[in-house]
């Protein structure tokens, strides 16, 4: 849990400093605050005498809490190799049990060994994931996930030490007996009454909370649900201006150059919730709430998630999170094994909500560094991201003339399964799909305009009214080049939830590389007849970048927006692509039979900025 700058654990950080603390600062009088330098993502911690660390997933950070800790910051990462050359005598990658790093400035880090040179006996050969470092009872606590292995369930463990560098004394067993649900990603928080709680959980089972014992080594048996299952993991809580902010991550963490992992936020005035997003939708709701906050923005960084937040010595908030580099996604010699370097960016509070760099998203240019030490001042300033402003309408179809003029079919379905009626276009959902080599779904298409544009549709899709579970039945928009190259924004049923999915498929691809990747955006319309509609919008812009070309690059940026009321919009992630003159705008209703999708209108507009 992120806290203020006093002697309390504040978590976070990592990213490569290109120009560290300015040397001129050393010449300033002691009474004058020293300005920090600049840095550029990613962080690449040094290995003394032996290269740099290229992956630091699920980072957790703490400022040293004792005088003997030398005002250093301490960083802990999930079990992974340090880089592609980190191999044993047999040539196998070495998996470190929570690699540990130190820094005086939060940007230049040094590898200091592993928290556990030998894994605890109860962990045996399993991975030790998602460390959580905290301090209370005059000692350090290092919580971690024991990954599933050979039929043993995932569980939460803990070790203690007088020093943030250990040696660590492991409890030797789990904090509580797992029940088969995913018991991942520990996060320790303190409520308004001073009671500590352990947040944990992932997609299978959702995020839950248990009361932590006074000694920090066990929990109560009662659980409080924090988020609905089948959506979030990686909980991180920050207390800011009387509100608890819950940061959580969603989708696939590790899908190489199509990783669309992203971070969302909700807030509550009680630690145990309920947490709601900026639109007032609960993160426990079936039409899952969550305001996008750390999302890919079209530069090289994808998979921006599992973050931690902290406040620096100048009162500026920051976050550290892992990502994937679209140009260099895998460990060397291990195609399919995604590297996750750590990134550092500023959190700017806008109208009571956190934004990353004022809404600009993950940075890939020089940034002002945080104030890591007493007396430092950061030069970071809030610069709000420009908004996508819709211009004149290029064309609009209200589906009220019975003709579908201007549209054509890719694989026309039976004429009894679609049509116009009562001012909507209806289409029965099909037991068909557009997914890798399964390409039998019907797509209603028309040509996309030239230049920058936005397409918006109002969609009704009601599977949750009929209960659970109708997995991956979906309806919505596509930007369609062909069956193997498209962008898709749909309202989709996933187990007991309804979500908005923003996906990309490409082909052909190199051997071992992915063809399909998917992220999620904001909440859908409600799960009742009273509020059934979801608004979907894709904004297309041209943005040339010669460093982002090839199969996973391109000069076109596609950004997703969703709304559950047509007035308040959530801006989601951005995919980069190159569909060119072959791009068409399409409608789909697929993934399973038994439902009817309804489109109230489709409108294409110019985009101004």
Model-inferred region functions:
Residues 2-35:
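Secretory targeting and sorting signals
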Residues 207-270:
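Aromatic-anchored, glycine/proline-accented short structural segments
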Residues 260-350, 530, 539-597:
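Aromatic sugar-binding interfaces of carbohydrate-active proteins
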Residues 57-90, 112-115, 123, 128-152, ...:
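Hydrophobic core segments of beta-strands in well-ordered, beta-rich domains
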Residues 36-68, 83-85, 107-134, 149, ...:
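Surface loop/turn signatures of beta-propeller and other carbohydrate-active proteins
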Residues 354, 360-609:
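Extracellular glycan-recognition regions
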Residues 103, 216-217, 256, 267-270, ...:
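Short edge-strand/loop segments of extracellular domains
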């Amino acid at each position: 849990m992120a806290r203020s700058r006093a002697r309390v654990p504040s978590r976070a950080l990592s990213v490569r400093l290109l120009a560290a603390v300015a040397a001129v600062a050393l010449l300033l009088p002691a009474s004058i605050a020293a300005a920090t330098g600049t840095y550029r993502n990613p962080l690449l911690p040094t290995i003394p005498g032996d290269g740099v660390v290229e992956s630091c997933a699920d980072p957790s950070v703490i400022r040293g809490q004792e005088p003997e800790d030398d005002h250093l910051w301490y960083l802990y990462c999930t079990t992974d190799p340090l880089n592609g050359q980190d191999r044993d005598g047999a040539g196998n990658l070495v998996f470190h049990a929570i690699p540990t790093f130190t820094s005086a400035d939060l940007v230049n880090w040094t590898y200091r060994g592993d928290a556990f040179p030998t894994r605890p006996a109860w962990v045996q050969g399993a991975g030790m994931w998602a460390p959580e470092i905290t301090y209370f009872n005059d000692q350090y606590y290092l919580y971690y996930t024991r990954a599933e292995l050979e039929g043993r369930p995932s569980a939460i463990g803990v070790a203690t030490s007088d020093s943030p560098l250990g040696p660590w004394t492991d409890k030797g067993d789990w904090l509580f007996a797992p029940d088969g649900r995913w018991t991942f990603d520990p996060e320790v928080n303190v409520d308004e009454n001073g009671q500590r709680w352990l947040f944990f959980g992932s997609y299978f089972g959702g995020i839950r909370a248990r009361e932590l014992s006074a000694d920090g080594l066990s929990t109560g048996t009662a659980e409080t649900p924090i988020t609905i299952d089948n959506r979030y993991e990686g909980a991180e809580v920050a207390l800011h201006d009387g509100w608890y902010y819950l940061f959580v991550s969603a989708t696939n963490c590790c899908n190489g150059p199509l990783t669309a992992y992203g971070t969302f936020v909700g807030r509550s005035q009680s630690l145990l919730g309920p947490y709601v997003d900026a639109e007032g939708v609960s993160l426990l709701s079936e039409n899952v709430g969550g305001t996008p906050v750390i999302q890919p923005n079209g530069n090289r960084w994808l998979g921006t998630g599992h973050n931690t937040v902290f406040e620096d010595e100048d009162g500026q908030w920051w976050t550290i999170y892992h990502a994937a580099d679209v140009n260099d996604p895998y460990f060397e010699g291990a195609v399919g094994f995604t590297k996750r370097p750590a990134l550092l960016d500023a959190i700017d509070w806008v109208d009571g909500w956190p934004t990353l760099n004022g809404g600009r998203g993950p940075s890939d240019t020089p940034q002002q560094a945080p104030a890591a030490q007493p007396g430092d001042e950061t030069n970071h300033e809030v610069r709000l991201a420009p908004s996508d402003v819709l211009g004149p309408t290029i064309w609009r179809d209200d589906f009220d003339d019975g003709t579908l003029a201007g549209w054509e079919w890719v694989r026309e379905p039976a004429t009894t399964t679609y049509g116009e009626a009562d001012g909507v276009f209806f289409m029965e959902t099909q037991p068909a799909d557009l997914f890798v080599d399964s390409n039998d779904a019907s797509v209603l298409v028309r040509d996309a305009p030239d230049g920058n544009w936005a397409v918006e549709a109002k969609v009704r899709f009601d599977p949750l009214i009929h209960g659970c579970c109708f997995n991956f039945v979906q309806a919505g928009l596509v930007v369609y080049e062909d069956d193997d190259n498209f962008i898709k924004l749909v309202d989709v049923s996933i187990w007991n939830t309804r979500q908005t999915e923003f996906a990309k498929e490409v082909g052909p691809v190199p051997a071992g590389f992915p063809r399909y990747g998917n992220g999620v955006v904001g909440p859908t319309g409600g799960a009742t007849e009273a509020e059934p509609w979801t608004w979907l919008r894709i904004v297309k812009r041209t943005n040339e970048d010669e460093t982002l070309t090839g199969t996973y690059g391109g000069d076109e940026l596609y950004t997703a927006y969703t709304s559950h009321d047509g007035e308040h919009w959530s801006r989601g992630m951005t995919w980069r692509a190159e569909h060119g003159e072959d791009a068409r705008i399409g409608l789909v209703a697929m993934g399973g039979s038994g439902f009817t999708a309804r489109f109230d209108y489709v409108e294409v507009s110019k985009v101004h900025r």
